[in-house]
């Protein structure tokens, strides 16, 4: 089966692909990328300062090769829907994903490693792996980098979830209303854990 990268598709053609073939979408390979993780930091001053740690390069091969992964993306750490619903819900239902044949669940956002780590600690996230895409390079390659000027966010990720098998995207749930002008109410309809779990369990 042929595969192709999303970066080679225009926004219109990517949307048409998902609309026309839906659940039978042809897999496409994610772009090779190196993420900048931060490990080993200790908390100081109530968790606002991190010291003693080091930078660690983590590649897409490390994260996705020979694994079945659910990854969800969101506009930003510490924001209302992301903090109150999406991230904690995925963490709470982590075992259900494992039972459905998933190896790992990842949360990715256009935030740096310090922010992602602090957010996970603040919400007491125990299971979901936090992936920092500080420069938005990976998010851009997924066709999901958008501008959110009304909130003063700058470039962030549009909200989505995806099922990735051995580095190939095999299912993609994108929230409606994709735009670059903040002309939306930050929809959260299809990138929730229940939608992905329903899809996974129907395939078992």
List where the protein language model places each region.
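Chalcogenol-based redox active-site neighborhoods
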Residues: 2-204
